[in-house]
């Protein structure tokens, strides 16, 4: 864990006046048992360009809660409908310094992956990772990634040619700890 994370608490994060976001960690029964839905963001001029992420995004006042934000964004980005999903609960919040975001992840489940409708401006494609792979950590190893601070060596999940790092990897790490 980066040393600056040791000193982060909710009060310290709040003093940075972060943008708030909610993400949906969707689990479904797939070919290899429980799988986690992820998406690839398109390449654009921004901090999270081309990264693997969970469906989710920035809080809007009409959302009222970050859980509602997660559901709204998941519908807008990949077509997941709240009424087709069983809410499981929330994971730990996290702070993303490069983009100054405070993020709350919410876990949902469905017996099968609902039909997805991708918003092309926000999603290049989706992929899923079997929970067994995440839990046995066989796909975790360091990766060199480019950040706004320059190149950095970080722990990452490697799956189907993709490098899953940053906040997404941290959330997957917590999910792994809960299911192991």
Q: What is the predicted role of each segment?
A:
Residues 1-53, 58-114, 145, 150-180:
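N-terminal leader/linker segments that precede catalytic domains of diphosphate-processing enzymes
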Residues 118-154, 158-160:
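NUDIX/MutT-family hydrolases
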């Amino acid at each position: 864990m980066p040393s600056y994370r040791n000193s982060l608490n909710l009060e310290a994060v709040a003093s940075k006046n972060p943008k708030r976001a909610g993400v949906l960690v969707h689990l479904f029964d797939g070919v290899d048992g429980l799988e986690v839905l992820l998406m690839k963001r398109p390449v654009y001029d921004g901090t999270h360009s081309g990264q693997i992420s969970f469906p989710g995004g920035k809080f809007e006042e009409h959302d009222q809660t970050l859980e509602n934000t997660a559901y709204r964004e998941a519908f807008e980005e990949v077509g997941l409908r709240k009424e087709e999903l069983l809410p499981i609960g929330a994971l730990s919040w996290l702070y993303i310094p490069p983009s100054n975001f405070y993020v709350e992840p919410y876990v949902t489940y469905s017996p099968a992956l609902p039909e997805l409708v991708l918003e092309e401006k926000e999603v290049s494609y989706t992929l899923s990772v079997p929970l067994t792979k995440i839990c046995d950590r066989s796909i975790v190893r360091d990766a060199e990634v480019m950040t706004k601070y320059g190149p950095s060596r970080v722990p990452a999940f490697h799956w189907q040619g993709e490098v899953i790092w940053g906040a997404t990897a941290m959330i997957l790490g917590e999910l792994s700890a809960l299911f192991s």
